[in-house]
Amino acid sequence: MTSVGIDAMEIWTGKLVLDLPNTFAPVKGEDPEKYTKGLGLHTSSFPDVYEDIVTMGANAAKKLMDRKGLTPADIGRIDVATESAFDNSKPVSTYIAGCLEQVYDGDFRHANKGERKFACIAGTQSLDDAYNWIKAGRNRGRAALVIATDTALYERGDPGEATQGAGAVAMLIDEDPDLVELSTEQGYGSMDETDFLKPNQQFPSVDGKRSMQVYLARMREALEDYESVAGRTHPDLFEYIPFHTPFPGMVRKAALLGFRHMTRDTDIEDDLESEIGRQPREEDFETWDDYEEAIRGYMDELKTTEQYRDWYGRVIEPTLDISSRVGNWYTGSVHIARLSALKAAADEGKDMTGKQLLVGSYGSGAQAEIHAERVQETWLDEIEAVDVDDQLAARTEISFDDYELIHDVHNHEKEIEVEEFTQPEAEFVFTGWGRMNERRYEYVE
């Protein structure tokens, strides 16, 4: 059977950067280590005045199409995942297609276009849609373009303000992929939750503590569901495990939970028994509260063991580098975690061919999804072609006052004019509104 997966990836980061420990923390009167050690964040990307989810998505897509030598005729489907949409009817994918048609011969007249919404998991759901479309044989030999693009902003003064970010990930989904093959097996954990939502509002309403609990619960359920179809997981089976990363500190909690689950009744638990005992079993406790207290105690000890620290450093830590420098990209965050891991492998000279990733996606509301990906022989060429470091180094640093101006510019409730901080070059830019209040864009050489 023909393999289907991610043939190529590209990113586009917001062109401005805010230094969290040195610029944001002092104004907020916070200890810088709250951000660097607690949240695991150092800098956040923000969009310039002329940037938004359309320009970032279109620019990432153009980089991908140019590198792969594609034209609109090669693309049969454009799916955009976002939770930053500005129109309740017209999908962002049509805007992005319109941008791309300005610079390529031909058009996307016969490409299916849509927009996915389920908080941050929508990017992975769009991958699933593209995968199923190709597997069903409905693609007519064409590839799918999946774009995850978001401007993740919180109300000023909100506790989540430090976890903001902006950027886009473009992925080409095709047969015989050059980067990773997606597994047929998937696992889900889904419940009706109100942990993070935006009911007719731009900025989220968040129950932070509840959101973390729901994230972990749904991830556990998704992993159990995945194992029901793919068989038991084990830490040694996966070279990297990219998680949805709203901030790296959240992944520390998810990784510990995952490691405990995967090592239960394994050689690793046997090896750890003399040091921290065996994992608590529910049947050994009279009440659920007693069982949970025992689990918490076990996990507190587990995270101090050499086995866990070594595994975390090898398998999890490399997935967090890009996120620590750009912040939360919502629908794109798990996909930059994948990119971060593979980039680390390339930098280390590691041969990833045939190795597996276990990818954990999450969206508030709430749903988690687990699937595996097998790295392809041509992965290194694809990863080395993505200019992550150059893009991040080229960002323009802003002051706290500048940050507040940019926040106001991208606040849908405010109308202010601010001079751009950077000069656009060879990219799509927002130019204003049309007669029906649609957003207008053009390509600047």
From Swiss-Prot:
The keyword Lipid biosynthesis applies. Catalyzes the condensation of acetyl-CoA with acetoacetyl-CoA to form 3-hydroxy-3-methylglutaryl-CoA (HMG-CoA). Functions in the mevalonate (MVA) pathway leading to isopentenyl diphosphate (IPP), a key precursor for the biosynthesis of isoprenoid compounds such as archaeal membrane lipids. It catalyses: acetoacetyl-CoA + acetyl-CoA + H2O = (3S)-3-hydroxy-3-methylglutaryl-CoA + CoA + H(+). Keywords: Acyltransferase, Isoprene biosynthesis, Lipid biosynthesis, Lipid metabolism, Transferase. Optimum temperature is 45 degrees Celsius. In contrast to bacterial and eukaryotic HMG-CoA synthases, is insensitive to feedback substrate inhibition by acetoacetyl-CoA. Enzymatic activity is inhibited by hymeglusin, which also blocks the propagation of H.volcanii cells in vivo, indicating the critical role that the mevalonate pathway plays in isoprenoid biosynthesis by these archaea. Optimum pH is about 8.5. One of its GO terms (biological process) is farnesyl diphosphate biosynthetic process, mevalonate pathway. (3S)-3-hydroxy-3-methylglutaryl-CoA binds at D31, C120, T163, S211, H244, K253, N328, S364. Pathway: Metabolic intermediate biosynthesis; (R)-mevalonate biosynthesis; (R)-mevalonate from acetyl-CoA: step 2/3. The active site is at E83 (proton donor/acceptor), C120 (acyl-thioester intermediate), H244 (proton donor/acceptor). It comes from Haloferax volcanii (strain ATCC 29605 / DSM 3757 / JCM 8879 / NBRC 14742 / NCIMB 2012 / VKM B-1768 / DS2). One of its GO terms (molecular function) is hydroxymethylglutaryl-CoA synthase activity. The gene is hmgB. InterPro entries: HMG-CoA_Synthase-like, HMG_CoA_synt_C_dom, HMG_CoA_synth_N, Thiolase-like. Belongs to the thiolase-like superfamily. HMG-CoA synthase family. The keyword Lipid biosynthesis applies. Its EC number is 2.3.3.10. This is Hydroxymethylglutaryl-CoA synthase.
